[in-house]
Amino acid sequence: LHKAYTMDQLEEAVKEADVLVLALPFTKETEGLISRHILSLMKEDSLLVDVARAQLIDREALLDKVKNNPRFHVAMDVWWEENEAYPKDGDLLLAYPNVIGSAHNAEMSSTAHREALMNALHNIRAFMDGKPVKGKVNREEYRR
């Protein structure tokens, strides 16, 4: 990592990035963030990794990028529809050799589960004691 970018600098960041990792929440502001325009700015031989939500990416634009740019690579653990993780007839991403995916299970580890449990227990205790909880979600930011 040579430089950190803000969201306002997304275009500049993707032009320079060899790897773009999406680890953002799916909100009204992030839906479709990786648009056809943003994909067009990415290096032809770059890698896009999505471990957040598929809805952050314009699906049709990504499919076009993958089809037309064999040096562009994608790694995904999230899908617009869960059954899309398994290729069938048609233009599914996993049908292309420059795409690798897993079935929405990359976070499945004993460490991740233990950490989630410990965080939940901490927050329950804090809530019961009238203290602030960590990671409180603003429901207005998220789709319902």
List each language-model region with its residue ranges.
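Structural alpha-helical scaffold elements that stabilize or flank donor/cofactor-binding regions
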Residues: 12-16, 38, 92-93
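Rossmann-like dinucleotide-binding domain for NAD(H)/NADP(H)
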Residues: 45-47, 51-144
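Adenosine-nucleotide cofactor-binding segment
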Residues: 1-33
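Rossmann-fold NAD(P) dinucleotide-binding segment
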Residues: 29-48
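Conserved beta-strand positions that form and line the central face of beta-propeller blades
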Residues: 3, 41, 136
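Structural motif corresponding to alpha-helix initiation and N-cap regions
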Residues: 4-10, 36, 59, 86-87
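Solvent-exposed, non-membrane alpha-helical residues enriched in polar/charged side chains
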Residues: 11, 39-40, 63, 125
